[in-house]
Amino acid sequence: MPYEPPTHTVERSLRATTGAKIIAGVDEVGRGAWAGPVTVCAAITGLRRPPVGLTDSKLLTIKRRTELEVELRTWVTSYALGHASPEEIDAMGMTAALRLAAVRALGTLPVRPDAVILDGKHDYLGAPWRVRTVIKGDQSCIAVAAASVLAKVQRDKMMAELGVDHADFGFADNAGYPSPVHKAALEERGPTPHHRLSWAYLDALPQWRHLKKVRSWVEGSVPEIEGQLGFDF
């Protein structure tokens, strides 16, 4: 299937139908991971021409994704990241954790967006935000595609840092997602403080079941990676 670059079609539609001037694209990464936070990026891009090759982060090679992320950090008008920790995910469930991370990201932006374009079918953000959901928005919408790349690369960096003290789990390679190395380490060593104990696979490990919800999230264990704050509107 030939590459079709994302466009500003959704942004233009929102401007025309709602009067919104400042529109943020929002995407998440880490939803299906066994370990680490779920991360949401909110990116404001305006209507400028995007960097060449911008698309859903999952469709890019690691090399190209990393190069593009560097370019995006200075190309976007502004962006910010929000995280929900494994402990928060265990306590409230994924939908509420996604909302928490998204609210944190949007609240870190230098201005409040008039509208939000959310990747996917379901609106996990809700009122009071004006939300337009777009299936495969990370492929079709420029602002969401930018958020996708920024979120993915920066969460991957975060997981690599967390993996320094947990080398057997392969966080630098699997970013906390299921993998044979990750599975073997869990079965041998049990979960780290960065694991989601409510996830079905971890919950089913009988030798570690006594640890379920009996751990505290270590303050500052998730490295701070700030979003760029800009006012170039």
Curated annotation (Swiss-Prot):
It comes from the Bacteria. GO terms for molecular function: manganese ion binding; RNA binding; RNA-DNA hybrid ribonuclease activity. Manganese or magnesium. Binds 1 divalent metal ion per monomer in the absence of substrate. May bind a second metal ion after substrate binding. It is an enzyme of class 3 (hydrolase). Its cofactor is Mn(2+); Mg(2+). InterPro entries: RNase_HII, RNase_HII/HIII, RNase_HII/HIII_dom, RNaseH-like_sf, RNaseH_sf. Keywords: Cytoplasm, Endonuclease, Hydrolase, Manganese, Metal-binding, Nuclease. Residues 21-211 form the RNase H type-2 domain. Its EC number is 3.1.26.4. A divalent metal cation binds at residues 27-28, 119. The keyword 4Fe-4S does not apply. GO terms for biological process: DNA replication, removal of RNA primer; mismatch repair. It is found in: Cytoplasm. Gene3D superfamilies: Ribonuclease H-like superfamily/Ribonuclease H. Pfam families: RNase_HII. It catalyses: Endonucleolytic cleavage to 5'-phosphomonoester. Signal peptide: none annotated. One of its GO terms (cellular component) is ribonuclease H2 complex. Its main location: cytoplasm. Belongs to the RNase HII family. NCBIfam families: PRK00015.1-3. Endonuclease that specifically degrades the RNA of RNA-DNA hybrids. HAMAP family: RNase_HII_B (MF_00052_B). This is Ribonuclease HII. It comes from Streptomyces coelicolor (strain ATCC BAA-471 / A3(2) / M145).
